[in-house]
């Protein structure tokens, strides 16, 4: 190979720079050109004018290449006193030039492009009365870089000033103001620039109003808003006025999938379960005992660390989500045997209307000696008070709701009293949670505090003592107080009026008779619950004798809802079957090895699979426009999965050849092809 002439190659860019970003032969005598801008340019050196009407195309040599091997990690620029420079026109000839573009550099010498530096180009548009235009573009010098802390960064506040300025000291887009920086204020309003832009009929761009940074208090909860599940982007159901009448054997597309309300509810619950709270471990510990990823559920309290708090946690044993209730500042002299006895007693209770108690332990992870109680987690659950009086949209209280609540709470009392325990004053409308429809409720927790701080635990759980029997009799009164407060606020649940809460000593038989919103049978139940029977004691048997007929109504509604959910699951089961069939088709269709296999050619045995795939998923109308018919897809996949003897005609894209084949033959061909891949 002949030697390269250095005089001829010195003006030709090196190909290694273009391809790789660098040339390893540069220091060994590579004769080609390795740097583009080696000449010095001063501020007074004005390049030759460029005709605006003439189109210019940049060459490959003028475009810098990114070198990933020598580039450093991204470091944001900080605004300093030397970060911006003001460019002024030094000659009157440049200002009076018509249709010329002047490029001014801020440094004495122009260097090659460094990927570590991201210069901000600031442009100012000036139009004078003589219709002479001069577009001046300035590139600021490299600002001093510093370490960026995302947790201590100021909240972004958009600027309300115009982004078109004649002063080069202002950026063309807003920045958060930096106090005590010693540099210029890039959010300051330039009166001269605003007046000039208005004088030349340059309308300022529309920008959002300024937002006070002190009012932006968002909890840093993962996932961020941009990765939330977009359940609301599904197509809504058609209104009843637009739905066509279907025959008994016909189905619409909405009837083939899960209903929208159930899908959205389950999606929101899954999102609540999967949310985590990235904490530094200073305020909220990362791991407590066998639980991790603590997410506060009541972090709106002012005194967060000194109050009873609830956390959503994940277990190391099974990976499921639970609720951890922390009781702070516990006496160090507490007997550990008392804690173990509480767990042994309450963990035996299995009631569908009582949240299951899972674990109890002591910990010092919160900076003090705390007792933690672990329960099952029900996402997006609301208390009776929030469900009917606070949450939007409100669900009004009806007589059917009252009977449903009474039956379920009676079941809780029966389960707890059968274990020789009592509920206590936790039986109120802020401790009873709505976990689902129709009116399914669960009692959150019972009197653990009394058991923990009672000096004599044996008297609380004794079977023959008067203490436990007296507390069980109080449970009936607490139930009557809860139902009375719900009944008397039926009208308040339909409007925005605040609910009235009555104490037990304020409820009288006369106040029950004065209520017109409930029937007489429910009034008899309330009178029985709040009355003092003297020597005779209340019991579950006597209580249920007042509304045994209503228990059948609750049982019937529960059975109906169970059958409805089973029908929904059966439809999803069919959809899962079709999903597996689509996976099989995608596994065998379009593989690289099939391009050279003669069996996949037009004369091959597996060519009908290609035609069937196009027939199902690549539909076109008579004009060749792509269309999507979900009914056609489901019908073909169901016939293929059943393997019926019905035949169909598959046509090639050029419409020159066709194949007549049955769904059974197609199914056998797909199954054999899939087995040949997996084996």
UniProtKB/Swiss-Prot annotation:
One of its GO terms (cellular component) is PAN complex. GO terms for biological process: DNA repair; mRNA processing; nuclear-transcribed mRNA poly(A) tail shortening; postreplication repair. The modification Phosphoserine is found at residue 252. Its main location: cytoplasm. SUPFAM superfamilies: Protein kinase-like (PK-like) (SSF56112). Residues 549-587 form a coiled coil. A zinc finger (C3H1-type) spans 8-37. Residues 275-548 are annotated as: Pseudokinase domain. The N-terminal zinc finger binds to poly(A) RNA. Contains a pseudokinase domain. The protein kinase domain is predicted to be catalytically inactive because some of the residues important for catalytic activity are substituted and it lacks the equivalent of the binding site for a peptide substrate. However, it has retained an ATP-binding site and ATP-binding is required for mRNA degradation, stimulating the activity of the PAN2 nuclease in vitro. Present with 1600 molecules/cell in log phase SD medium. Regulatory subunit of the poly(A)-nuclease (PAN) deadenylation complex, one of two cytoplasmic mRNA deadenylases involved in mRNA turnover. PAN specifically shortens poly(A) tails of RNA and the activity is stimulated by poly(A)-binding protein PAB1. PAN deadenylation is followed by rapid degradation of the shortened mRNA tails by the CCR4-NOT complex. Deadenylated mRNAs are then degraded by two alternative mechanisms, namely exosome-mediated 3'-5' exonucleolytic degradation, or deadenylation-dependent mRNA decaping by DCP1-DCP2 and subsequent 5'-3' exonucleolytic degradation by XRN1. PANTHER family: DEADENYLATION COMPLEX SUBUNIT PAN3, PAN2-PAN3 DEADENYLATION COMPLEX SUBUNIT PAN3. Belongs to the protein kinase superfamily. PAN3 family. This is PAN2-PAN3 deadenylation complex subunit PAN3. It comes from Saccharomyces cerevisiae (strain ATCC 204508 / S288c). The lineage of its organism: Eukaryota, Fungi, Dikarya, Ascomycota, Saccharomycotina. The gene is PAN3.
């Amino acid at each position: 190979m002949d030697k390269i002439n250095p005089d001829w190659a010195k003006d030709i860019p090196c190909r290694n720079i273009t391809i790789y970003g660098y040339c390893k032969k540069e220091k060994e005598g590579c004769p080609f050109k390795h740097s583009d801008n080696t000449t010095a340019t001063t501020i007074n050196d004005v390049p030759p004018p460029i005709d605006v009407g003439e189109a210019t195309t940049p060459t490959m040599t003028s475009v810098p290449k990114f070198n990933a091997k020598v580039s450093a990690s991204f470091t944001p620029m900080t605004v300093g006193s030397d970060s911006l420079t003001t460019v002024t026109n030094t000659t009157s000839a440049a200002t009076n030039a018509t249709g010329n573009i002047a490029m001014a550099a801020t440094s004495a010498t122009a260097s090659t492009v460094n990927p570590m530096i991201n210069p901000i180009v600031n442009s100012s548009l000036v139009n004078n009365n003589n219709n002479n235009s001069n577009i001046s573009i300035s590139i600021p010098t490299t600002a001093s870089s510093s370490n960026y802390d995302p947790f201590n960064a100021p909240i972004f506040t958009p600027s309300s000033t115009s982004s078109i300025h004649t002063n080069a000291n202002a950026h063309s887009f807003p920045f958060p103001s930096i106090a005590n920086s010693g540099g210029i204020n890039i959010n300051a309003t330039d009166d001269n620039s605003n007046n000039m832009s208005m004088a030349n009929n340059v309308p300022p761009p529309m920008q959002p109003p300024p937002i006070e940074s002190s009012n932006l208090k968002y909890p840093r909860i993962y996932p961020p808003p941009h990765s939330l599940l977009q359940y609301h982007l599904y197509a809504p159901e058609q209104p009843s006025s637009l739905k066509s009448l279907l025959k008994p054997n016909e189905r619409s597309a909405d009837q083939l999938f899960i209903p929208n309300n159930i899908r959205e509810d389950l999606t929101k619950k899954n999102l609540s379960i999967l949310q985590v709270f990235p904490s530094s471990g200073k305020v909220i510990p990362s791991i407590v005992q066998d639980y991790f990823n603590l997410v506060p559920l009541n972090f709106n309290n002012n005194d967060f660390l000194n109050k009873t708090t609830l956390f959503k946690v994940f277990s190391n044993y099974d990976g499921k989500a639970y609720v951890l209730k922390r009781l702070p500042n516990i006496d160090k002299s507490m007997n550990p045997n008392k804690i173990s006895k509480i767990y042994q007693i309450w963990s035996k209770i299995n009631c569908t209307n009582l949240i299951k108690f899972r674990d109890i332990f002591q910990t010092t992870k919160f900076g003090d000696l705390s007792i933690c109680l672990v329960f099952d987690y029900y996402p997006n659950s609301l208390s009776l008070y929030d469900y009917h009086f606070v949450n939007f949209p409100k669900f009004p209280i009806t007589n059917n709701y009252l009977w449903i609540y009474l039956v379920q709470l009676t079941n809780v009392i029966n389960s707890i009293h059968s274990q020789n325990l009592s509920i206590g004053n936790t039986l109120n409308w802020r401790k009873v949670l709505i976990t689902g429809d129709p009116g399914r409720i669960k009692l959150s927790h019972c009197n653990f505090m009394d058991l923990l701080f009672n000096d004599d635990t044996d008297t609380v759980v004794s079977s023959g003592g008067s203490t436990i029997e007296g507390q069980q009799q109080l449970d009936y009164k607490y139930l009557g107080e809860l139902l009375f407060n719900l009944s008397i606020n039926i009208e308040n649940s339909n409007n925005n009026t605040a609910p009235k809460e009555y104490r037990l000593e304020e409820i009288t038989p006369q106040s029950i008779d004065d209520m017109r919103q409930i029937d007489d049978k429910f009034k008899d139940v309330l009178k029985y619950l709040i009355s003092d029977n003297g020597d005779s004691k209340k019991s579950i048997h006597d209580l249920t004798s007042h509304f045994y007929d209503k228990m059948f109504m609750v049982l019937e509604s529960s059975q109906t809802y169970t059958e409805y959910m089973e029908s929904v699951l059966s439809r999803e089961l069919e959809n899962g079957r079709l999903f597996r069939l689509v996976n099989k088709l995608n596994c065998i269709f379009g593989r690289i090895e099939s391009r050279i296999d003669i069996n996949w050619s037009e004369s091959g045995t597996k060519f009908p699979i290609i035609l069937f795939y196009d027939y199902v998923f690549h539909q076109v109308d008579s004009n060749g426009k792509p269309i999507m018919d979900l009914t056609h897809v489901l019908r073909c996949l169901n016939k293929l999965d059943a393997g019926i003897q019905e035949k169909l005609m598959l046509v090639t894209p050029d419409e020159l050849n066709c194949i007549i084949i049955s769904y059974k033959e197609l199914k056998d061909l797909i199954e054999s092809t899939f087995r040949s891949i997996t084996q």
